Amino acid sequence: CISTQVGCPVGCVFCASGVGGLQRQLSAGQIVEQAMRVRELCTDGFRLSNIVFMGLGEPLANYAATVQAIRTMNAEWGMGIGARKITVSTVGLPTQMRRLADEKMQVTLALSLHAPTDELRRELIPWAERVSIDSLIEAGKYYFEVTGREVTLEYILLGGVNDSIEHAEALAGIAK
């Protein structure tokens, strides 16, 4: 998992990354350096083959540095990691999701949904008050239409909070 920020502005109630809030953005070089350090640590025939932007921070809230880092990691002169082996995980910024689609880089987009309703999602992800699940799904459809890459849904099960049969059925409806 690669971080794009020091701290996180999102404040998900189940995640420690946002406890101190956002401290600062990382540069593209600092983002790439994390992957390079991991690659240096690889031994015994193990090689770094996949990158997930899911460490500290919201990757699409540091859009320019994230995209520049992806291009560097993907480039033959950089790390030579295939775009389809790079995943960007986001809580969902629809405008940035569409921008990423328009970059046509073929990276995998993963949407951290964590709730099947806007009301519950706002409780779990305070930042979610800015955007509806419907707008995220529309941005995800756009991403698929432009890139041909399916969007992955991420969902943390929290006992007694978002794990009922009704939640599962609603989530299945969203995933269709």
Residues covered by each model-derived region:
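Canonical Radical SAM [4Fe-4S] cluster-binding loop centered on the CxxxCxxC motif
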Residues: 1-30, 44
